[in-house]
């Protein structure tokens, strides 16, 4: 029975909605507060804290159609995309979840009914195979005795290599924590395709395809590998939307389902590619443009690390496949509208950011175009010179990566098409040397999270919205990542957890509170406050006495610091609203930092903000401050917040009930931070900096209150000091500076003219030193203490005079450092294959203490401790003589 992808998605949601599941929208592709994941890669990610016991579920039964990415980290399908029928970087995962409600029986019955009932998907029962874990007799019996599946089509799967719980049918979140057996459901495409049934380790082929995984979380794995029963049994299932759609549409490839087929046809029309059937490059581009659009929509921008680097890799892989199809113009941005049209169920949220997405893609492709051609030339040359082992060195791959922006995957992709391997071990070793300080999760966080997991029943209640102090009880003490009953070590960093606290835990960009905890026998100085799930942790040092579990303490927040933080937090809301009004609706928050000194606000926008726009923003916000607008807080249902147009952050995951902060009639935003009660408390607002931090992302830094007044006073003082130096008053200062500038520019032109005449005289004198090796004009000479720009200009002039030849200039700098520049005319490079970069390498090997690099026609290096420049000149002349004399094409 043919069903469109939109119908399949909706029927899945409708089926489980009828089974009393709450339909929860897809979360962002960027996981919220989860450093273990690069991207959301499954439906359960947004419920991870529920499975860990850190957050109580709003609903017992949930169903989602989650947008996912698998193009980085542990789950990385990027290299397979376009070359297999099922791999995608961006896809949707259909899933139903139970949090302490139904378990194996209902989960299996639900899956069977949806797949086989003629009112739903209507698949043939004889086409369905199932695997269960070898020790999960309960699931096996449900499948056989209740569902009625033939024992010929159900397989028990054991552990791999006898490793405990290492099985395709045993799911675990990590080495410790929630885990359990799973039932995997497969579809048999029939005997026309090759492949062995599920359970075989080899020769799987493509006949049997996994379509759904039902995970039953029933155990908590301990450090000693012992499994203990979880107090709350849960179900987590996942089924790829594109994969089940392919089955329902009678095709064996994700790229042949309706959404891809239509998208590929339209892409081929725009790119003017005639052959679009089984065109692997079009498959790559169709997949990648979907990934690009949704990543940028969720706030990711191209960069050199993390999520931004994955996006950059995807864009550059797309561009390279465009070049394979003969498209040399910038094209990716033209495809954005096609994604919006064909992903019409989310077209509204995409269309609002269409211009931003197109601009970011245009800028990134333009940037890559500048180096793509040169990088391909280097790669082509390197591939031609390979030995019989057909392995490209990791050094060349790293040079392509650092100099020409070729992600390693792109280099491997190109090499793979020619059956050439890349020495990834060498590449990784070079990368490791370059990045010894790469970021890793600290052992503290790992240990601390384990502690939280073992005591997740404890929670902290935050009361700091209404008060700055309260009586509290100590419910946990930590020192050296260990839970303790008594704290007596003074000045040692420690952590205190209270049942009730006025201290705000760092979140939403707002820093944590500081202050004091005072007990009967001790005083604890709180330096910072952090939030882990529902637990608020006070980090600091005991400054006197002792603290005990169960002891009553008086918790006192630093009131003045908190008030300044609240002023800045409310100001970010005013800034966000002002940017939307002045720059446009495409503006979305990308991040923030809010402390008591200043705040910064990152947002999506593709151009620098003009001084006029900055003035407009400042004027609007200051007027709102002086209008004495009320700041109100309301707790309401998420749906109600949407209906009143509250701003919601893309990366944030919200509960059923949300806190809404409204400032007059100019700002409504979901927020958990602390705020002023009236805008007049802000006093004054001034933007101090505005700059770009990535492709399509700008940052504003701003100050308020006394800090803003200090900025004005400091600028006034600076103007007065400049006026004093210029011997002018404030009124005429600008005219005086213009006069100074005009005089400077006149003197600068005269100096440059004089230098130019001297350079020409020097060039003419050097030309007289030209000699021949065979028929090649050669100039090797030296100069002293010349600026690099002047040196390069002189080399260019010498090449012009020679018309054909090799120029080598040695610039002797201070401390006896020789800066050698080699430039070769185009005819010698193309006809006789004399390369400047090769000559540099010869010199480096000869002198043994040089370092440099370059291109075919231009290269340079530095040599330390040159004591005799004349000997160096002779040495290079001799080297050139040997090289040129051995080139047979030169007579």
Curated annotation (Swiss-Prot):
Binding site for Zn(2+): 569, 573, 671, 675
Example of a GO MF term: zinc ion binding
GO cellular component term, pick one: cytosol
Top-level EC class as recorded in UniProt: ligase
Cofactor(s) listed in the protein's UniProt record: Zn(2+)
Compartment(s): Cytoplasm
Reactions mediated catalytically: tRNA(Ala) + L-alanine + ATP = L-alanyl-tRNA(Ala) + AMP + diphosphate
Domain remarks: Consists of three domains; the N-terminal catalytic domain, the editing domain and the C-terminal C-Ala domain. The editing domain removes incorrectly charged amino acids, while the C-Ala domain, along with tRNA(Ala), serves as a bridge to cooperatively bring together the editing and aminoacylation centers thus stimulating deacylation of misacylated tRNAs.
Assembly description: Homotetramer.
Official protein name in the record: Alanine--tRNA ligase
Gene name, Swiss-Prot/TrEMBL: alaS
């Amino acid at each position: 029975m043919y069903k469109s992808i939109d119908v399949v998605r909706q029927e899945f949601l409708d089926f489980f909605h009828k089974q009393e599941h709450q339909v929860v929208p897809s979360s962002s592709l960027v996981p919220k507060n989860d450093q273990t994941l690069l991207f959301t890669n499954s439906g359960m990610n947004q419920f991870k804290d529920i499975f860990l016991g850190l957050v109580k579920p709003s609903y017992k039964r949930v169903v989602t159609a989650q947008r996912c990415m698998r193009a980085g980290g542990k789950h990385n399908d990027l290299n397979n995309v376009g070359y297999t029928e099922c791999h995608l970087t961006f896809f949707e995962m259909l899933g139903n979840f139970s949090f302490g409600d139904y378990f194996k029986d209902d989960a299996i019955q639900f899956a069977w009914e949806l797949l086989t009932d003629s009112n739903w998907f209507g698949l043939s029962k004889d086409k369905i195979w199932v695997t269960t874990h070898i020790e999960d007799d309960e699931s096996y019996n449900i499948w056989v005795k209740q569902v009625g599946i033939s024992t010929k089509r159900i397989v028990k799967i054991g552990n791999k290599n006898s490793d405990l719980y290492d099985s395709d049918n045993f799911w675990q979140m990590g080495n410790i924590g929630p885990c359990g057996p799973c039932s995997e459901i497969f579809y048999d495409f029939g005997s026309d395709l090759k492949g062995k049934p599920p359970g075989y380790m080899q020769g799987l082929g493509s006949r049997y395809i996994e379509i759904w995984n039902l995970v039953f979380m029933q155990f908590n794995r301990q450090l000693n590998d012992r499994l203990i029963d979880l107090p709350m049994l849960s179900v987590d299932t996942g089924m790829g939307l594109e994969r089940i759609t392919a089955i329902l549409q009678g095709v064996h490839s994700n790229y042949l389902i309706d959404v891809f087929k239509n998208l590929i046809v339209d892409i081929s029309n725009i790119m003017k590619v005639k052959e679009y059937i089984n065109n692997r490059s079009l498959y790559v581009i169709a997949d990648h443009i979907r990934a690009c659009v949704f990543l940028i929509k969720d706030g990711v921008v191209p960069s050199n690390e993390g999520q931004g680097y994955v996006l950059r890799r995807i864009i550059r892989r797309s561009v390279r496949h465009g070049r394979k199809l003969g498209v040399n113009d910038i094209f990716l941005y033209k495809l954005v509208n096609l994604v919006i049209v064909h992903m019409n169920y989310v077209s509204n949220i995409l269309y609002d950011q269409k211009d931003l997405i197109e601009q970011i893609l245009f800028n990134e492709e333009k940037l890559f175009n500048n180096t793509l051609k040169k990088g391909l030339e280097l790669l082509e040359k390197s591939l031609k010179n390979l030995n019989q082992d057909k392995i490209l060195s990791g050094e060349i791959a790293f040079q392509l990566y650092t100099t020409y922006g070729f992600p390693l995957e792109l280099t491997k992709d190109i090499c793979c098409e020619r059956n050439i391997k890349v020495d990834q071990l060498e590449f990784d070793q070079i990368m490791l040397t370059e990045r010894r300080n790469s970021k890793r999760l600290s052992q503290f966080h790992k240990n601390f999270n384990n502690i939280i997991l073992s005591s997740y029943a404890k929670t902290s209640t935050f009361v700091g919205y209404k008060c700055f102090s309260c009586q509290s009880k100590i419910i946990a003490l930590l020192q050296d990542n260990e839970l303790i009953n008594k704290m007596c070590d003074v000045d040692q960093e420690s952590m205190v957890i209270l049942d009730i606290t006025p201290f705000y835990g760092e979140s939403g960009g707002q820093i944590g509170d500081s202050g004091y905890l005072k007990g009967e026998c001790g005083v604890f100085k709180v330096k910072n406050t952090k939030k882990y799930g529902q637990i608020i942790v006070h980090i600091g040092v005991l400054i006197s006495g002792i603290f005990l579990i169960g002891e009553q303490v008086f918790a006192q927040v630093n009131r003045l610091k908190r008030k300044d933080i609240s002023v800045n937090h409310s100001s970010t809301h005013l800034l966000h609203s002002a940017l939307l009004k002045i720059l446009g609706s495409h503006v979305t928050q990308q991040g923030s930092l809010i402390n008591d000194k200043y705040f910064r606000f990152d947002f999506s926008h593709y151009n620098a903000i003009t001084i006029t726009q900055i003035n407009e923003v400042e004027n609007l916000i200051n007027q709102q401050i002086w209008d004495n607008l009320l700041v109100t807080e309301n707790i309401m249902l998420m749906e109600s917040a949407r209906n009143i147009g509250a701003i919601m952050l893309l990366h944030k995951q919200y509960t059923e009930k949300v806190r809404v902060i409204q400032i007059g009639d100019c700002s409504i935003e979901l927020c958990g931070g602390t705020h002023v009660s009236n805008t007049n408390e802000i006093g004054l607002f001034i933007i101090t900096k505005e700059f770009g931090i990535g492709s399509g992302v700008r940052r504003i830094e701003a100050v308020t209150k006394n800090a803003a007044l200090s900025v004005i006073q400091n600028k006034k003082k600076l103007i007065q000091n400049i006026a004093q130096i210029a011997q002018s008053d404030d009124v005429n200062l600008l005219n005086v500076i213009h006069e100074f500038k005009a005089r400077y520019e006149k003197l600068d032109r005269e100096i440059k003219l004089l230098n130019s005449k001297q350079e020409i005289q020097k060039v003419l004198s050097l030309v007289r030193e030209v000699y021949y090796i065979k028929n090649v004009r050669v100039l090797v000479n030296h100069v002293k203490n010349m600026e690099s720009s002047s040196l390069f200009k002189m080399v260019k002039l010498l090449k012009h005079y020679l018309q054909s030849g090799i120029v080598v200039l040695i610039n002797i700098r201070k401390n006896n450092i020789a800066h050698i520049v080699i430039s070769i005319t185009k005819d010698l490079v193309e006809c006789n294959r004399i390369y400047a970069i090769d000559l540099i390498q010869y010199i480096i090997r000869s002198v043994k203490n040089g370092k440099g690099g370059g291109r075919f026609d231009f290269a340079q290096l530095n040599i330390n401790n040159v004591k005799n420049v004349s000997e160096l000149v002779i040495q290079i002349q001799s080297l050139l003589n040997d090289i040129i004399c051995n080139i047979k094409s030169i007579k």
